[in-house]
Amino acid sequence: DVLDVFNQNEHKERILLTGRDIEFSFKNSENGMHNFSFNLESGQLVAIMGGSGVGKSTLLSILNGNIIPGEGSVCLNGHPLSDPECKQLIGFVPQDDLLIEELTVFQNLWYTARLCFANLTEKEIEDRVNTILEDLDLSKIRDLAVGSPIRKTISGGQRKRLNIALELIREPAILYLDEPTSGLSSTDSEKVIMLLKEQTHRGRLVVVNIHQPSSEIYKLFDRLWLLDTGGYPIYDGNPIEAITYFKRIANYTDQDISVCGTCGNINPELILTIIDAKKIDDSGNQTNIRKITSKEWHELYVASRPKFQEVKPTPLPPNHQQKPSIWKQFCIFLERNIKTKLTNKQYLCIALLETPLLAVIVALLTRFVPDDGYSLLANKNLVSYIFMAVIVATFTGLSISAEEIIKDRTLLKRERFLRLSRGSYLSSKMFYLLCISAIQSLLFIVVGNLLIGIGSEMFLTWWITLWATSFLANLTGLILSQSLNSIVAIYITI
């Protein structure tokens, strides 16, 4: 509370996030979010708790604008969340890993910063990246490749902090996190939540979806939202007081005790136990019927909820982000894509050796040698060679572009908040594939035509023909990568 007083004086440009009568239901289902209203201010660390499938992630998606509620509204300083200026003040760290595994820790942050701050020089961007690495205790691993979640080169806790850093480098006013402690040890979990607590001291509003917090983590939260089955909010208030609130309704004998008098610990699991308590039948056996249903808990919450007043629009906090031009975005996307490919040695070997090897196989299979010696004009299989060359160009063009977009889907989900040019991203992919297809077509012609005995007179014609065929296959592969939902489905289609 003392810190909050100092923070209010230090951060005069405060934000107010409000929700009024939010209603959302999934198609053919009552699950979603029901009758939820709230006021949140900057400098708060808010926890969303509840059992599995109660709608915690759905609520986060409503708050960050990914899901539009059927009724009600979410506003930032009185401005609707759909306002582009509001979108740029929001940071979202989903549960999925959003790192580019081939790049280093520094490079992941470097390219994100370049896409956010066109008004800064490269030296200023580098200083900003180094500062965030120091703040999040990642400077010692700055030159390590991130690796995949399965084949790790950095720890799980470091990966979580790096995912958070990708959002913090944009300096958002509001930061949402979906299960930031999942899969982490208790020590790493506390480090992550302490990091988020520090962000609230800098004037940010942080909202966290969390499942099973420890006692130490639970006591760090300033505000608690509890959801029950079906998406019903059942509590909004002080985390410590939540335990006595539910004990009192459930008629516990120690309903005034929330903290252990001996060790000072809190048991957050007790809240979920009380909420989900089952009735006992006449034989003393536990039934599957709850003592208090989710709708009854919700009615109690609504009865105790204060009346919210309408908020008049006030100026939004200044936003220091500046998008690069469309051309600059194209260059950054292209550079990032090339850097990613160059660090993947396996990819390079396949991309550069695939077509020469296929050229050798095709040429040897179609090289017809009669008894009186080989002659190109006497080769009965020349038409077959031409046909198979086109098939190879089509196959390599499809295979090399098949994963270009689908593997970036989680990354694009995060960059959606940056409001970058989709055309620049797609153009960078097409230009890269155009170049790699030119190299592959050239290698096939040099090796295959040499073995089959075709002279250099028609070299340019052969190259343009196979290059165009391969590039058309590239475009088809990009369409498949964008349209289909799994890599398996893409390769089956190919």
Predicted stretch roles:
Residues L175-E179:
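Catalytic Walker B motif of ABC-type/P-loop ATPase nucleotide-binding domains
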Residues V2-S37, S42, G51, E71-L76, ...:
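Topological signature of polytopic alpha-helical transporters
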Residues E171:
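Conserved catalytic motifs of ABC-family nucleotide-binding domains
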Residues E167-L168:
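ABC ATPase C-loop
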Residues I68, S73-C86:
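ABC ATPase NBD Q-loop/coupling interface
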